[in-house]
């Protein structure tokens, strides 16, 4: 977009650092630019004033609400923008993040702008995926004439739905329990946080109900003529007498014989381009830092110009993607020593959210600490995906006979490192067997009879919990990371040694609601709501119809819960009494 000397623009970004980057990028362009920013949402939804008194309003009337109030959420930004719009006559350019929430924030800015300048006041939409100067200049050259109103409506639906359902259920549970126990502060309910908690409780139940089964096996240490030692094992045996008999037949031998030896090669594919969910799962596993904090740090790297936009569900590069900038950042950031001569050949995924490319490095980050670790992961994954070969793993399988007793030895090693030479985070450990040949004799060093028992499944780590949430369509790539932290803040779970353990309160909440109706806690109900929201984005549903459809599903469940609330409240009150300092602090908003 060419700017004449008399062109005037008011550019509003979503973050101060992004505003600074835009201001710097546009220095070489003719025109008068007022560049400012908000700090997230300008406005928020709230219940009408007559619904403020928790004790005076029936919960079922809240979930039927369709007339909601817009309230100022960021007073400082609101007043600053209002003053700028009144004092400047430039054309508004909305430069918020290029996603659903960014679009909704853009509509809030536009609403304030047109309330001052008139309903026909002109505006433009600026879209970009990184704050690199070259991309911002390109973005300025292709300003759009309108917002994506389907994105706005989808984000608005999520906001309204979460408010009316969360407020209705939270008030019902809190007030009913408080009648029995005055010390109760808040029993928070949200259609995403409850299924997230359900996964943790479900796993805990599997662990607690697990009944171990004893088994036995033979473990033989063997040695080749060259002095190479390795271990072979029998299959698991569930009868002790059979195991003891097998051991007695094997232990009297001095020589074992190789029956078969096979080596097979398996391709280990290089990682797909980085999307939010994959990156957060890996980084949570590697750093043991909460995904919500990791995402916040990724946003810092983005807003300061080191990586592209970090909230994306895309794992395939567009055909016209320019790899040079990412490669340059990777080299200058010390990930690889010299520029490769081979052209980019990315392994492509199948997902494209239509808004952003995969996450990639934009500029070298030479700082230290967790920010450096995050940047390194993104840069290494970018290079491994686009410029490295797949790896190859050799699997070894040997059948060993000790008399008539058959044992098995398995080994593996990296036969061709490929991308592991750069992206080495999950490189498999090697357990290489010596090269064996059928008929080869081996010296038996020892044969032991080992007793063991089956183990319960492990508790969920944050990485595994995020995987469960994505698999069941709980939340989005932009919101999913917040829910594990949220249920911990509510006092429903504790995070110990990197895994989640439900508190008595959290387990009681899930158990009591599940007895009332399993749809209150299982992910299938929320998954249906996500489908309704996606229908808005596809243009198949209007906002009002979508909200009616979504709210009706939970209204029916609320009525069901009302019918059993005495039982639910009794159990929750007892859990509160026993849990003591696990009680969450009272919060009125952010029902999700």
Model-found features: residue ranges?
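Metal- or metallocofactor-binding catalytic centers and their adjacent structured scaffolds
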Residues: 240-273, 280
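Basic, low-complexity terminal or inter-domain segments flanking catalytic cores
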Residues: 2-10, 112, 170, 290-292, ...
